[in-house]
A protein has these predicted regions:
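Short, glycine-/small- and polar/acidic-enriched structural segments
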Residues: 2-138, 148, 153-160, 175-176
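Pocket-lining segment of extracytoplasmic ligand-binding domains
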Residues: 61, 142-143, 151-189
Length: 189
């Protein structure tokens, strides 16, 4: 049986169950010919599912609400981590000092932008600060590259990926994660 699986992101450690299954021949042993498709855009899998071009897609639970369609259903999670927004140290200082903040994200729309803003505003309230000068810019998937290029923060970051990558790149960061501001975790696939 041929199964096409569209990812939400480029292949990375989040996708280990699929990578290991292919590497160990587990799918072939069960007569499954799995094709993994890396997207150009974060929502490509939803479009391909809706058009019946693929059988499965991965994406974060919040996008299932955002991109709801009658012919698409969630069959479960295979992965969960902490996550939220990662700031450069300078970006975080700008945030608490009320300066303009530019945040890179793979998507920018009213739903995801509101969640990012909620994280920031809840954090600022806890430390008795305010800042409404926040701009979210849609870019590609490479958060750490954008932080190193001058963005103040990156949104929709996962600890197991961008959290680790920032350490490996020697980038000093301040993390504002969902759990820090009492928002239920949705950093899962």
């Amino acid at each position: 049986m041929k199964i096409k699986l569209a990812l939400e992101w480029f292949i990375n450690p989040d996708h280990l169950p699929f990578i290991v299954g292919l590497d160990k021949g587990l799918y072939k042993k069960n007569n499954i010919d799995l094709e993994i498709i890396e997207p150009e855009g974060h929502y490509d899998g939803f479009k391909e599912l809706a058009q019946n071009n693929i059988q499965l897609a991965t994406n974060e639970p919040l996008h299932l609400i955002e991109k709801y369609q009658n012919n698409i259903c969630s069959i479960g999670n295979f992965f969960e981590t902490n996550g939220g927004i990662i700031f450069t140290i300078k970006g975080y200082e700008n945030l608490v000092n009320g300066k303009e903040i530019k945040i890179t994200s793979p998507v920018s729309n009213p739903i995801t932008d509101k969640i990012a803003n909620d994280i920031i505003q809840r954090h600022l309230k806890k430390i008795n600060k305010t800042n409404k000068n926040i701009k979210i810019v849609a870019n590609d998937f490479y958060h750490i590259k954008h932080l190193k290029a001058g963005f103040d923060a990156a949104w929709l970051c996962f600890e197991n990926f961008e959290g680790v990558e920032s350490k490996l790149e020697g980038l000093e960061v301040k993390k504002l994660y969902l759990e820090d501001v009492e928002i239920p975790n949705f950093c899962a696939l």
